[in-house]
Curated annotation (Swiss-Prot):
Organism lineage: Bacteria, Bacillati, Bacillota, Clostridia, Peptostreptococcales
Organism: Clostridioides difficile (strain 630) (Peptoclostridium difficile)
Function as written in the Swiss-Prot or TrEMBL entry: Ligates lysine onto the cytidine present at position 34 of the AUA codon-specific tRNA(Ile) that contains the anticodon CAU, in an ATP-dependent manner. Cytidine is converted to lysidine, thus changing the amino acid specificity of the tRNA from methionine to isoleucine.
EC number of this enzyme: 6.3.4.19
UniProt record similarity statement: Belongs to the tRNA(Ile)-lysidine synthase family.
SUPFAM superfamilies xrefs: Adenine nucleotide alpha hydrolases-like, MesJ substrate recognition domain-like, PheT/TilS domain
Name the UniProt record assigns to this protein: tRNA(Ile)-lysidine synthase
CDD domains listed in its UniProt record: TilS_N
Reaction catalysis annotation: cytidine(34) in tRNA(Ile2) + L-lysine + ATP = lysidine(34) in tRNA(Ile2) + AMP + diphosphate + H(+)
Gene: tilS
One Gene Ontology term of the molecular function aspect: ATP binding
Record HAMAP family: tRNA_Ile_lys_synt
Coiled-coil portions: none
Pfam families assigned: ATP_bind_3, TilS_C
Amino acid sequence: MIFDKVLSTINKHNLIQKGDKIVLGLSGGPDSVCLLHVLNRLKKDFNIEIYAAHLNHQIRGIEAQKDALYVSKLCEDMGIIFFVKSINVPKYCENEGLSLEEGARKLRYEMFYEIKDKIKANKIAIGHNLNDQAETVMMRIMRGTGLKGLKGIDYIRDNCIIRPILDVERNEIEEYCEAYNLNPRIDKTNLENIYTRNKIRLDLLPYMKDNFNSNVIESIVRMSNSLKSDNDYIEKEAEAKFREVSNIKEKGFVEINLDDFVCLHDAIKVRVLRNSIKHILGDTNFVDQRHIEDIMSLEDNSKVNKMLTLPRNIFVYRKKDSIILTNEEIVNEEIEFYYNVPSNGFIKIKELKQIIETQVMSIDRYKSMKLDNSSKGFDFNKVKGGIVIRSRRQGDKIKLAMGSKKVKDLFIDLKIPREERCKIPIITDSEGIICVGDYKISENYKIDENTKEVLKINFNKL
């Protein structure tokens, strides 16, 4: 019965092709032992090579050593090449700040990929079953998840990780092992309700089965499978939109154009953000729905220059026209400069890669000129002492129509990104600020009906 069911799953989801080289995660428990036995029976039909990999987590002492001996003997009897590795998982988790579940899973998969690369295999087979599927969906519901989380465990992931017994129930697996006298090892920690998954397996699902629906496992999985095709379609659309709205400059950096992003449906937005994080980290582990919602809140124009920090050192910055996601904090390095400016001539500001050009002329000539936004004019007779162009300083103020305003507050009002503020030149005379770049002119130096001479300043990029 199981053999036919597994073969059907393999064919339906195209999990194995002739000539595949497969690394099988072998814990010694019923699931992985059943999977090994079934694939070994299929070995000749598919012309596949099977290699087994076992990790001793150094958690269960002598029992863990017995597990390793058991799987070693099992592989020897079947003629399967066997790899074993021993790692102090508790110590690793303590150093990395991970739970035992998270750390053990991470180390197992690292070992699987290491062996896969070493022997040039192309598949990794994992013994997840139907009950695991239901437990995973329930865990994600309680943690908070979207449609992608509800679709549960994939039959195949990254064109590499396959789960051939995902349609098989745990009790069927146990019966199979008994029928073939496989005598798998039983991890007693799986019988202790100290982990979230164990509590779902041992307490929640049995309670639901006894009090609500005797077929609750099948119902959860059926729901999960029905959502999968919907999710797959949306994911495909989201991937295309991600490419359209994102500027991917380098590994670890994604900039999302807000004009395009805000027009998307929320279902697509969520996936665009997840794709952004996946581009940076390689996956979206430990980034859940609330983190995605926090990023989406940055659409609001009142959030310009806000910054978020997500798990695994993802930094999110709201710029004027974009949202930036990166794995490196953007450090604002202050640029300092100070130059005396001639009344007529030009000066090169190498720190800004700009040329500042100055010219004194009559008011009539000034009014006859066609000026663009890069030019500013001031009443030359109101200028006191020499003209200086410099970087901003703490406490800088400029006189505006409504009174004096701190330059820092002016930058905030103008929504100038924090890292750009140090690049805006401040032009002063001996009495105060004449203008802040080409953004604002002080009321004290503006042209009026009494102006006879104008100081024209041009801000030109090199």
